[in-house]
Amino acid sequence: MKLSEPLLVSLAAFSQAVTALVAFPGAEGFGANAIGGRNGQVYVVTNLNDSGTGSLRDAVSATDRIVVFAVGGVIKISDRIVVSKRVTILGQTAPGDGITVYGNGWSFSNADDAIVRYIRIRMGKGGSSGKDALGIAEGNRMIFDHVSVSWGRDETFSINGDASNITVQNSIIAQGLETHSCGGLMQTDGGVSLFRNLYIDNKTRNPKVKGVNEFTNNVVYNWGGGGGYIAGDSAGQSYANIIGNYFISGPSTSVTAFTRGNANFHGYVQNNYYDPDKDGQLDGFELGVSSSNYGGMAIMSSKYNYPAVAYTMSPAEAVTYVTKYAGASKVRDSVDTQLIAQVQSWGTEGGLISDEATMGGPGTLNGGTPAKDTDGDGIPDEAEKQLGTDPNTNDSMKLHSSGYTYLEVWANSLVPSTYH
């Protein structure tokens, strides 16, 4: 979609009716109406193998699946995982400490209607050269919620090309590996919502934005000399809302929060805070609404009519929320625990890394014990009794009165559905 004026990037890009069922309770933004595998089949991941029956790679290799887990732990992969269309990945269903996928990256290119929740994607030094930890080149309607992504060799989390209606919310985008060390590109005219995320320890592109973007209540910590939020740096036209974010300098930070904008980048900005002094206290100030404070972008007087959050936090509230809940936070692993501790040092800790060994690698996870599931339909017997389904009949994909499958109703009950 080629944009010529802001009116073209309004809710028209968010074409579903406002009454459409959202991906899960709490889904927001451009990607809120992704359907995932709701009209397909359940696939239960039963092992930590790189491939083969019962593996995560096999689970996402076909369309129209809801993926749940009867195992927890670290899945070590050699090649990139390529995700098919209309796949839901519900990492919160894993027992123990959940799921980490380590060793290479993921492609969600053309993975229309993806829903991804509560999983860790950690690429690492041994991953494919010049590739992202999580990359999307094209595709429509995707939402990533409570995902921890780190150690990309090119970008860590990037969205490019003919991609549209995508949300990344409540997630951690961390530690792109040197020498590139990039948070990621967010450059599509089709609409990307970034809500309540943590960008941390990336030298540059935290993120770099072109096209249509809603950037609300994010925390950016310890960006390097390449820049924090990079505003287009392009002859192309961009239109963004930038609201209620907090930028906190760390040991690696040597430039201001916003860089490399120009008059082609049109930004509505409101209540963004900046703490540059690295003094061990969160004591930032509101950035004045001027082009010079926002990297030279053209400042707009009216907010773009994009799908917004239900509740806009203050920047301080966003920091409190992100440090408590962002990423695959049902159980925080050792990596995310270290990253959050860096943020809470308020400028005194953190660094750019070239090898994940600096963080102790992906760590170890308690695999837990899967609950009894007699019929193998993905819902534990005890939960089926509470739902009113039959523990002896494969009925998890039947629709509940809410419009979700019974499997989704159960999985959604395992984690919070609101953030305020």
From Swiss-Prot:
<keyword id="KW-0106">Calcium</keyword>
<feature type="binding site">
    <location>
        <position position="281"/>
    </location>
    <ligand>
        <name>Ca(2+)</name>
    </ligand>
</feature>
<feature type="active site">
    <location>
        <position position="205"/>
    </location>
</feature>
<comment type="similarity">
    <text>Belongs to the polysaccharide lyase 1 family.</text>
</comment>
<feature type="binding site">
    <location>
        <position position="275"/>
    </location>
    <ligand>
        <name>Ca(2+)</name>
    </ligand>
</feature>
<feature type="signal peptide">
    <location>
        <begin position="1"/>
        <end position="20"/>
    </location>
</feature>
<dbReference type="GO" id="GO:0000272">
    <property type="term" value="P:polysaccharide catabolic process"/>
</dbReference>
<feature type="glycosylation site" description="N-linked (GlcNAc...) asparagine">
    <location>
        <position position="394"/>
    </location>
</feature>
<keyword id="KW-0961">Cell wall biogenesis/degradation</keyword>
<dbReference type="GO" id="GO:0071555">
    <property type="term" value="P:cell wall organization"/>
</dbReference>
<protein>
    <recommendedName>
        <fullName>Probable pectate lyase C</fullName>
        <ecNumber>4.2.2.2</ecNumber>
    </recommendedName>
</protein>
<feature type="domain" description="EF-hand">
    <location>
        <begin position="262"/>
        <end position="297"/>
    </location>
</feature>
<dbReference type="InterPro" id="IPR012334">
    <property type="entry name" value="Pectin_lyas_fold"/>
</dbReference>
<feature type="glycosylation site" description="N-linked (GlcNAc...) asparagine">
    <location>
        <position position="165"/>
    </location>
</feature>
<feature type="glycosylation site" description="N-linked (GlcNAc...) asparagine">
    <location>
        <position position="202"/>
    </location>
</feature>
<dbReference type="GO" id="GO:0030570">
    <property type="term" value="F:pectate lyase activity"/>
</dbReference>
<feature type="binding site">
    <location>
        <position position="279"/>
    </location>
    <ligand>
        <name>Ca(2+)</name>
    </ligand>
</feature>
<feature type="binding site">
    <location>
        <position position="286"/>
    </location>
    <ligand>
        <name>Ca(2+)</name>
    </ligand>
</feature>
<feature type="glycosylation site" description="N-linked (GlcNAc...) asparagine">
    <location>
        <position position="49"/>
    </location>
</feature>
<keyword id="KW-0456">Lyase</keyword>
<dbReference type="InterPro" id="IPR018247">
    <property type="entry name" value="EF_Hand_1_Ca_BS"/>
</dbReference>
<dbReference type="GO" id="GO:0046872">
    <property type="term" value="F:metal ion binding"/>
</dbReference>
<keyword id="KW-0732">Signal</keyword>
<comment type="function">
    <text>Pectinolytic enzyme consist of four classes of enzymes: pectin lyase, polygalacturonase, pectin methylesterase and rhamnogalacturonase. Among pectinolytic enzymes, pectin lyase is the most important in depolymerization of pectin, since it cleaves internal glycosidic bonds of highly methylated pectins. Favors pectate, the anion, over pectin, the methyl ester.</text>
</comment>
<dbReference type="InterPro" id="IPR052063">
    <property type="entry name" value="Polysaccharide_Lyase_1"/>
</dbReference>
<dbReference type="Pfam" id="PF18884">
    <property type="entry name" value="TSP3_bac"/>
</dbReference>
<keyword id="KW-0325">Glycoprotein</keyword>
<keyword id="KW-0624">Polysaccharide degradation</keyword>
<keyword id="KW-0964">Secreted</keyword>
<keyword id="KW-0119">Carbohydrate metabolism</keyword>
<dbReference type="GO" id="GO:0005576">
    <property type="term" value="C:extracellular region"/>
</dbReference>
<dbReference type="InterPro" id="IPR011050">
    <property type="entry name" value="Pectin_lyase_fold/virulence"/>
</dbReference>
<feature type="binding site">
    <location>
        <position position="277"/>
    </location>
    <ligand>
        <name>Ca(2+)</name>
    </ligand>
</feature>
<feature type="region of interest" description="Disordered">
    <location>
        <begin position="358"/>
        <end position="396"/>
    </location>
</feature>
<keyword id="KW-0479">Metal-binding</keyword>
